Each structure stands twice: as C-alpha cells, then as structure tokens.
Amino acid sequence: MIQLEPPFRHGTQGDAPALAELINVAGEGLPWYLWTTMAEPGESAWEVGRRRAMRATGSFSYRHATVAELDGRVIAALVGYPLPDQPAPIDHDQMPAMFVPLQELENLTPGTWYVNVLATCPEYRGRGYGTRLLGIAERLAAAAGRSGLSIIVSDANAGARRLYERCGCSEVAVRPMVKEGWVNPGENWVLLVKRTG
C-alpha cells in the first residue's frame, strides 16, 4: 500500500455512502440503473450501492478506493485495481449483455491497472483532484507491477476524456454501448490507455 498525503487517503467502509454517489457520477447513472435491478424488496438502489461499497471483495469495494477528503467530507474518489495478465474468457450466457462491451475492452489491456471510477463532486471540479488522483493511480500501478493505466469512458463524456488525454492516455479501442433501459447520450465505450512500464 502506498503512502498518501492529505487530503488523500485510502478508502474505508465508512466511505460507502460517498463512494456510491461518486461511482454513480462517474458511471453516468449506469450504477444506479443496475442497483435498481439488484434491490431486494424494500431496499433502495442507494442502499444496494452502499452495501456493495462496504464489501471487502469485488471490483467496487472500499478496499480499492482512494478518496480526497475536505472538512470531513469525501469530495473525490478513485476506485481501481490491477487487471490479470491473462483475461478470463467472457461467458456470454452469464454476463448481462450491457456489460459485454465493457468486458471486451477491459480484456484488451491485461497487465494494466484499471481505473474503474474517477469522480469529483461537481462543486470541487476544476481544482486538480482528478489529475492528482490519476497520479496516485500511476503510483498504485507501479507498486502493483502493472504496465500502465486503462480507463473506459463514454464517448459523450468529453470532460472526462479531456482529463484522461491531458494526463497522457490515448484511445486504443471502441465498442458500441448496449443500453437496455439505461438512458445515456453516448453511443460508444472508449478504452484509453497510458503505458508507464
């Protein structure tokens, strides 16, 4: 685990409410849409998101999170993890269709450190938190022996894409979105990579 300086720190279970909100911001509403389908009777989509963030395992876990905290409030977050050197084949019978293009893109970058979530609360954007979190992601990638960063973004999210490109990421592949009932102006998922090793 790398050392972090304030306002950055490693995530905790107590960050679950903020992480759920920020993953939904980064995912442009897709997480909330999915959580509504996963909710138990009487459980809200937000409760599902918080429950998933509190898990010790899984891709969306506080254990994979780095947060920026100001005055006791989490205002930005990075969630990421190392991808295996050999991706597992996609099981089209088990994986929901809307995830297949995302998994196809992820599988194109084995051995990288995958930035699953990078989000800043709207009122704190433009202050360098995203750039600094990407710098932390590079340090985490190096500590994990990964060859670079990989990120998937909607083609409609021009602001995020500008940030990633400004930080040295380049487009390497595109896949059409499968939306089902999710509403989003994007048409494609774009895979960006920054090679560091």
Residue ranges and their predicted role:
Residues V67, R73-P82, Y114, A119:
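Conserved beta-strand in the GNAT
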Residues T120, G126-A143, R162-R166:
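Conserved acetyl-CoA-binding loop-helix of GNAT-fold acetyltransferases
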Residues P7-L22, G29-L34:
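A short beta-loop-alpha structural element at the N-terminal edge
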Residues G27-A53, H64, I90, F99:
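Conserved GNAT-fold acetyl-CoA-binding loop/helix
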Residues P82-V117, K179-E180:
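Conserved acyl-donor/pantetheine-binding loop and adjacent beta-alpha core of acyl/acetyltransferases
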Residues M54-V67, L83-A88, Y114:
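A short helix-loop-beta-strand connector motif used in the catalytic cores of GNAT acetyltransferases and
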